[in-house]
């Protein structure tokens, strides 16, 4: 695990301890179970791909540890419908405060402003956060293989599926991919950003594809570094049709127009 990831995960464990003290697990679990049915995150992605179109998980992100503030004019309730009109399949909304200046309220505002399923983009280290995600309205969660043991991922996945949520498992290398393929979720995200150096290489996705050749039911989601139509074309030529993109859209005045420009 990289230094930045270790630091983030340590802060997350502190957040969970504080959250548990403020709101016991039984209460947040009841809140999660009382939510209306989740929107179908996996189905939205699969539907786009089946129709021969790219499935775009469009991200709503104000800042990042490596880049600082990415978007000053940050209004999730305006960004989400802009993405929806441009053809996004799903949303990804940062809820991490200390590192990405995100908030649960951003996810709620974005989801309320459109009909798209929304992923809680955060660093999950405890099952409490899975219930918390559904309680705030998230339709899917992210599990980062670098942060979690296989047993932890399996436990969180089972809880998420029990709550009707989708799961995106994120990997960075072959060892993490081997663990991810032991989960039930079809969604395997490959992050092209090296979390140790913050360098981005699309070869990360391309290099892991041979290991997924026999996994017909898996959907590869390429994450980070999709900045130009040529990047999209390269991925689609190699059979990758699902994309998680944020920064490229956040840096232009109209994020929906950015999505259209990138994916045609």
Curated annotation (Swiss-Prot):
- Enumerate the InterPro entries for this protein: Aldolase_TIM (IPR013785), Indole-3-glycerol_P_synth (IPR045186), Indole-3-glycerol_P_synth_dom (IPR013798), Indole-3-GlycerolPSynthase_CS (IPR001468), RibuloseP-bd_barrel (IPR011060)
List the NCBIfam families: PRK00278.1-2, PRK00278.1-6, PRK00278.2-4
The record's EC number reads: 4.1.1.48
Coiled coil, from the record: none
Name a Pfam family for this protein: IGPS
Pathway, according to UniProt? Amino-acid biosynthesis; L-tryptophan biosynthesis; L-tryptophan from chorismate: step 4/5
Task: Kindly give the SUPFAM superfamilies that the UniProt entry links to this protein.
Answer: Ribulose-phoshate binding barrel
Which keywords does the record carry? Amino-acid biosynthesis, Aromatic amino acid biosynthesis, Decarboxylase, Lyase, Tryptophan biosynthesis
Q: Which cysteines are joined by disulfide bonds?
A: none
Q: Which PROSITE patterns match?
A: IGPS
Q: Which reaction does it catalyse?
A: 1-(2-carboxyphenylamino)-1-deoxy-D-ribulose 5-phosphate + H(+) = (1S,2R)-1-C-(indol-3-yl)glycerol 3-phosphate + CO2 + H2O
The processes (GO biological process) annotated in the record are: L-tryptophan biosynthetic process
Write down what this protein is called: Indole-3-glycerol phosphate synthase
Q: What family is this?
A: Belongs to the TrpC family.
From the UniProt record, which GO molecular function terms apply? indole-3-glycerol-phosphate synthase activity; phosphoribosylanthranilate isomerase activity
Q: State the source organism's domain of life.
A: Bacteria
